[in-house]
UniProtKB/Swiss-Prot annotation:
Its EC number is 3.1.-.-. Keywords: Cytoplasm, Endonuclease, Hydrolase, Metal-binding, Nuclease, Ribosome biogenesis, rRNA processing, Zinc. It comes from Bifidobacterium longum subsp. infantis (strain ATCC 15697 / DSM 20088 / JCM 1222 / NCTC 11817 / S12). Its cofactor is Zn(2+). It is found in: Cytoplasm. Binds 1 zinc ion. Pfam families: YbeY. One of its GO terms (biological process) is rRNA processing. The gene is ybeY. This is Endoribonuclease YbeY. Zn(2+) binds at H115, H119, H125.
Length: 182
């Protein structure tokens, strides 16, 4: 199983943590060990462009998933192999959401990674029942992953003096964006 992690931001992010999480979640969901996944961390501008292009929604968002092969979770046996797809995460939006939720940016980005994987596997949260199922599963996966890890306190940070890319985005594109209205 291959999980490639790319960081195109100034955030200091340990790619191994996200690779380990991706491999573990795919194993738990019984996706073939021959499957590939890419996780990419980007700044607000690139994810805002993707958000507009693919969802016709303005502004940066927290996570977007781009499926490749239509792989689905296994039912006790491993599913066929293939390229699962790409997950794009914006640490700036994750940090804002984490502050509002009262947990760390790292915890939020790990949650968003699981959320993105579940979308790639066909889960959605359009209806209340779908939301209950998907959010329950992502919470269960995240808490179990934390329980199994000995380094659960690893953090994602910004070097001192790094400009706030989300504030710069808002200044260039107009403030007043409401993250809760996604």
């Amino acid at each position: 199983m291959s999980v490639d992690v790319t960081n195109e931001t100034q955030w200091v992010i340990d790619p191994k943590v996200f690779s380990d999480l991706g491999i573990w979640v795919l194993d738990q969901m019984r996706v073939s060990t021959q499957s590939d996944l890419t996780i990419m961390f980007v700044d607000p501008n690139p994810i805002a462009e993707l958000h507009m292009r693919w969802m016709n929604l303005e502004g940066p968002t927290d996570v977007m998933s781009f499926p490749m092969d239509e792989l689905r979770p296994g039912d006790g046996k491993t599913v066929m192999e293939g390229v699962l797809g790409d997950i794009v995460i914006c640490p700036w939006v994750a940090a804002q959401q984490a502050a509002a939720a009262g947990h760390s940016t790292m915890q939020e980005m790990l949650l968003l990674t699981i959320h993105g994987i579940l979308h790639l596997l066909g889960y959605d949260h359009v209806t209340p029942e779908q939301e209950r199922q998907m959010f329950g599963l992502q919470r269960q996966l995240l808490l179990t992953f934390f329980a199994l890890r000995h380094d659960a306190n690893v953090q994602a940070t910004l070097p001192a003096g790094t400009p706030d890319a989300l504030a710069l985005y808002d200044a260039a594109h107009g403030a007043g964006r409401d993250l809760d209205s996604k």
